[in-house]
């Protein structure tokens, strides 16, 4: 079952044709990795899935993107879409407030005031991000006091708190050390049981370790996509072969 269906998508930043006739289905409750060299369009596609590209001046989009069958550019309220499709960025971006308030912020913005409800969501979200045991005694201390890896897991917990169906991740471990990266990858293995995950990564090894599906982009084109094992072990296109083998890119 597809969570997203992208059909003949073209995206322009002014005169720059960043995505060229992209068609891809993204399956539910699996991890899909988007790979390719810098500037190939993978982050542009990621940000199209929750309409973050709307915020870029001069952007133009043609084609269709459906989320659970609904055209996200025609039939879905953007606010609702972004609640359903959470995002974790390259660098951890905790809010300048306590660990607790980072998680509760979105719920409070929606009008939730019941402390018991907030407490439960904060704990469950931190547990879901494998962070609870590390922070449960300091929930009301500043989030900036956490390590980089902990901050990134906090950002994942913040996304989980809104009960999304999808989590988009734009190189979520590129600023982290190997130990923190390993924890995030272990976490993603658990998250896939509940959420659809789409991740942009420059690490071929990471894509092989964590993803069910892989899509390879090159100069704005989707060259090839399919099962991760097939993409890495038996690619059909010579450009894919060259990239995953490290010959270029």
UniProtKB/Swiss-Prot annotation:
Protein topology in the membrane:
Peripheral membrane protein
Q: Principal localization? A: membrane
Query: SMART domains annotated for this entry?
Result: AAA (SM00382)
Q: Report residues binding ATP.
A: 36-43
Gene3D superfamilies in the record: P-loop containing nucleotide triphosphate hydrolases
Keyword list, A-Z: ATP-binding, Cell inner membrane, Cell membrane, Membrane, Nucleotide-binding, Phosphate transport, Translocase, Transport
- Give the main EC class: translocase
Q: Which PROSITE patterns match?
A: ABC_TRANSPORTER_1, ABC_TRANSPORTER_2, PSTB
Per its record, the protein catalyses:
phosphate(out) + ATP + H2O = ADP + 2 phosphate(in) + H(+)
This protein is called Phosphate import ATP-binding protein PstB 2
Q: To which species is this protein native?
A: Shewanella oneidensis (strain ATCC 700550 / JCM 31522 / CIP 106686 / LMG 19005 / NCIMB 14063 / MR-1)
Q: Which gene encodes it?
A: pstB2
